[in-house]
């Protein structure tokens, strides 16, 4: 009845029925205080207040991509692990850069801390497995650990929630910006992914044709020469087209696959095995590169 009277008085305008955010915070703090002190009584005994991660947490991977491990609003405490790999042949060190934010690229997110994991056994690009674990405790303290699964070597960093962390207003601003630039960020991320897919395929083929456990001893000399020429030309094209569009990278990948995949298929048919390694299906199951 009162709401209808107000609506009539203000020329049909609907009254605001939402909750004042400042009041909501005050009520929540009061309830939490009552629960923690044990003085909440019957009013709070069935209430469960959950803390959440205010922003997405992740690390930087090739191309400046923000690879997300713990999404925004994940209930804490929480723990998440993901396996990554190396970007270059014989790479013995990876840099772990920890960010928070909602954008697709780390340049638009906030750096929380970084550390290096050294002593990785030299191997072809994409071979080492680096497991990165994010763990946020009930107090919001973030522990990040990186471990080389091959050598067992590891490094870690602890990021507390009292070292210049963002205010609620800054968090809301970052979320708004992510929504505002979502379409633009998506296009940039797709272009980087397309470039990485081409690069990964080419290096995968190069490694296979030189690895005796894979294709080195199974290829005819002319077959190997065709693949070497195709991969060499593709790498030169990548060097000359650093800022190509997504469609350009995808087209170049199709060109290289059209040369390499039939050769790989023929080799495995001759040897009675199944095609492997160079296919784009396997490529999609690969690990992000550091």
Curated annotation (Swiss-Prot):
Disordered, as annotated region: 268-290
Keywords on record: ATP-binding, Endoplasmic reticulum, Glycoprotein, Nucleotide-binding
InterPro entries hit by this protein: ATPase_NBD (IPR043129), HSP70_C_sf (IPR029048), HSP70_peptide-bd_sf (IPR029047), Hsp_70_fam (IPR013126)
UniProt name for this protein: Luminal-binding protein 1
Motif Prevents secretion from ER mapped to chain: 287-290
A GO term for molecular function: ATP binding
Residues with attached carbohydrate: 241
Gene3D superfamilies: 1.20.1270.10, 3.30.420.40, Substrate Binding Domain Of DNAk, Chain A, domain 1
Chief place of localization: endoplasmic reticulum
Superkingdom of the organism of origin: Eukaryota
GO cellular component term of the entry, any: endoplasmic reticulum lumen
Family to which this protein belongs: Belongs to the heat shock protein 70 family.
Biased composition (Acidic residues): 280-290
Subcellular location: Endoplasmic reticulum lumen
Function: Probably plays a role in facilitating the assembly of multimeric protein complexes inside the ER.
Signal sequence, start to end: none
